[in-house]
């Protein structure tokens, strides 16, 4: 009796070539739906699944392969007892299962997709066959990745069978495939529930959670050479930085990815052309401009010493003029929505420079959570998305700000959100002038930012990611000539700090929203 293979795939890449090779090797093919149509149109002998089961498809195609004559043939072990049971029930063995699943991830990534349409793209029969075949790896081979087709055919041609070691590897890949698929579905449904519970007191976080991802590459090492590392893409994160395309340069490192994420997060908070230059996940220069070039030159001028070897992000296309200016300096990575052909030609001369473009196709569909590992577990929180609009700010000082001064403070406030706490940003004219990051006391960060700004602190605008516990930070700022301060407020000494602002003739506003970053 010929060996039998079930083929049921949504991704038709390499399908005909695989099926033709299996037929040449003496396999009988069983198939469903679009896969059956593709194979018959290619002139290949194939049996439709209902011919094998003797049972019609029902419920609009929801039930096709969920039948003992399919699952019995997959799950049976090569024991006398199992083989006798198959014979008694007219069931034939199935030796090879080739399945990939309904395109749920691609479906929910489409703009405007309905909840019902997403639900209909949840595969049931496919994962059932995948898991059955993977469980019975002792006898059955399961293939979920079209990239494996050539090596499967090669093994069958050269050895006459797929080795047990290879079957075990294929089974592990199959379970990872279904786990990622289920995680994508769970993430989508959880996000939908979170949206529904925004106005309720229920927690947006599920009682149990599985984190899924597909390994994109092994990295040379982690933060340090003694640490191994790898990069994984989330199952439901199309349109995000993780799905950006590297179009030039050396392989990205662990530290590159960390800094890219920090840089990309900053520029995405602005609608105007923006540029951020990052070192060790903190911005050493951030600026706005009428063009990408102007934003870059202002960001560079903010701290040209620290910018050396930095990671840069733009929320606009990098054109030739901007590329020519970038080329004059050493950077590790440049991230942008796009690079013009002329810009790429200019930057290609710096062969090691990594260029990454991230598609600008609307807001990506993903669960807005941040995950941090701790020893023995992990923490999950919502993304710190957006910030308090100017219209919701509270002016607490006697001195009142002009509209332009509020816009200056808004720029500093948007940047300070992305700086490690305790965080202070000095800015003016849409350009950071000094950044105090990661100090254990707030006045220490103020002093660092002021020292970095130097004389430019005169007339500058200061943002603090959290409240001032004492007036000392305002006193330091006023001595340097700072004009206005934006902070969340919320200290038990707010009244004392407000009194100091009035005494020092500072403008001060409260946003009533903190932006700690650890």
Swiss-Prot record:
Annotated EC: 2.1.2.3, 3.5.4.10
A GO molecular function held by the record: phosphoribosylaminoimidazolecarboxamide formyltransferase activity
Biological process according to GO: 'de novo' IMP biosynthetic process
Q: Pathway it belongs to?
A: Purine metabolism; IMP biosynthesis via de novo pathway; 5-formamido-1-(5-phospho-D-ribosyl)imidazole-4-carboxamide from 5-amino-1-(5-phospho-D-ribosyl)imidazole-4-carboxamide (10-formyl THF route): step 1/1; Purine metabolism; IMP biosynthesis via de novo pathway; IMP from 5-formamido-1-(5-phospho-D-ribosyl)imidazole-4-carboxamide: step 1/1
Protein's UniProt keywords contain Amino-acid biosynthesis: no
The record's listing under Pfam families reads: AICARFT_IMPCHas, MGS
Which reactions appear under catalytic activity for this entry?
(6R)-10-formyltetrahydrofolate + 5-amino-1-(5-phospho-beta-D-ribosyl)imidazole-4-carboxamide = 5-formamido-1-(5-phospho-D-ribosyl)imidazole-4-carboxamide + (6S)-5,6,7,8-tetrahydrofolate; IMP + H2O = 5-formamido-1-(5-phospho-D-ribosyl)imidazole-4-carboxamide
Q: Which SMART domains match?
A: AICARFT_IMPCHas, MGS
Q: Where is the MGS-like domain?
A: 1-144
Q: Which UniProt keywords apply?
A: Hydrolase, Multifunctional enzyme, Purine biosynthesis, Transferase
Q: SUPFAM superfamilies recorded for this chain?
A: Cytidine deaminase-like, Methylglyoxal synthase-like
Q: Which GO terms describe its cellular component?
A: cytosol
Specify the domain of life of the species encoding this protein: Bacteria
Task: Fetch the NCBIfam families from UniProt.
Answer: PRK00881.1, purH
Q: Domain description from the entry?
A: The IMP cyclohydrolase activity resides in the N-terminal region.
Q: Which family does it belong to?
A: Belongs to the PurH family.
What is the name of the protein in this document?
Answer: Bifunctional purine biosynthesis protein PurH
Name the species this protein comes from: Desulfitobacterium hafniense (strain Y51)
Q: What gene does this protein come from?
A: purH
């Amino acid at each position: 009796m010929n060996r039998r293979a079930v083929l049921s795939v949504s991704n038709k890449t390499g399908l005909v070539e695989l099926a033709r090779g299996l037929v040449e090797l003496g396999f009988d093919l069983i198939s469903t739906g679009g896969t059956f149509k593709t194979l018959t149109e290619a002139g290949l002998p194939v049996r439709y699944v209902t011919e094998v089961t003797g049972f019609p498809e029902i419920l609009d195609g929801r039930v096709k392969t969920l039948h003992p004559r399919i699952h019995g043939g997959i799950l049976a072990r090569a024991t006398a007892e199992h083989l006798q049971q198959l014979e008694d029930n007219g069931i034939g063995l199935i030796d090879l299962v080739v399945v990939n699943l309904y395109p749920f991830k691609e479906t929910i990534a489409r703009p405007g997709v309905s909840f019902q349409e997403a639900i209909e793209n949840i595969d049931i029969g496919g994962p059932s066959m995948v898991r059955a075949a993977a469980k019975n790896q002792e006898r059955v081979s399961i293939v979920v990745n079209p990239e494996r087709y050539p090596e499967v055919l090669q093994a069958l041609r050269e050895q006459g069978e797929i080795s047990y070691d290879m079957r075990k590897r294929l089974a592990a890949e199959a379970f990872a495939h279904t786990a990622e698929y289920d995680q994508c579905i769970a993430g989508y449904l959880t996000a939908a529930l979170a949206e529904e519970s925004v106005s309720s007191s229920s927690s947006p976080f599920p009682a149990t959670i599985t984190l899924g991802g597909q390994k994109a590459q092994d990295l040379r090492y982690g933060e340090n050479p003694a640490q191994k590392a790898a990069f994984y893409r989330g199952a439901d994160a199309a349109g995000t930085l993780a799905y950006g395309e590297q179009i030039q340069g050396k392989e990205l490192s662990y530290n590159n990815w960390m800094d890219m994420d920090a840089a990309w997060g900053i520029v995405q908070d602005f609608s105007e052309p923006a540029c951020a230059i990052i070192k060790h996940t903190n911005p050493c220069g951030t600026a706005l401009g009428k063009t990408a070039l102007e934003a870059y030159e202002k960001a560079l001028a903010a701290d040209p010493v620290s910018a050396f070897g930095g990671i840069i992000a733009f929320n606009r296309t990098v054109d030739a003029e901007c590329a020519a200016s970038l080329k004059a300096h050493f950077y590790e990575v440049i991230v942008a929505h796009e690079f013009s052909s002329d810009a790429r030609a200019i930057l290609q001369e710096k062969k090691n420079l990594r260029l990454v473009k991230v598609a600008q196709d609307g807001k990506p569909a993903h669960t807005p959570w941040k995950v941090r590992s701790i020893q023995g577990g992990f923490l999950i929180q919502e993304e710190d998305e957006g910030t308090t609009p100017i219209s919701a700010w509270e002016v607490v000082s006697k001195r009142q700000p002009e509209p332009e001064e509020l816009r200056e403070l808004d720029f500093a406030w948007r940047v300070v959100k992305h700086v490690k706490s305790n965080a202070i940003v000095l800015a003016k004219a849409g350009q950071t002038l000094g950044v105090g990051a990661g100090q254990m006391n707030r006045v220490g960060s103020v002093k660092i930012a002021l020292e970095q700004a130097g004389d430019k602190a005169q007339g500058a605008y200061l943002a603090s990611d959290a409240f001032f516990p004492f007036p000392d930070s305002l006193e330091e700022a006023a001595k340097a000539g700072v004009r206005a301060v934006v902070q969340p407020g919320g200290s038990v000494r707010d009244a004392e700090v407000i009194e100091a602002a009035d005494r020092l003739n500072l403008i001060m506003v409260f946003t009533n929203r903190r932006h700690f970053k650890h």
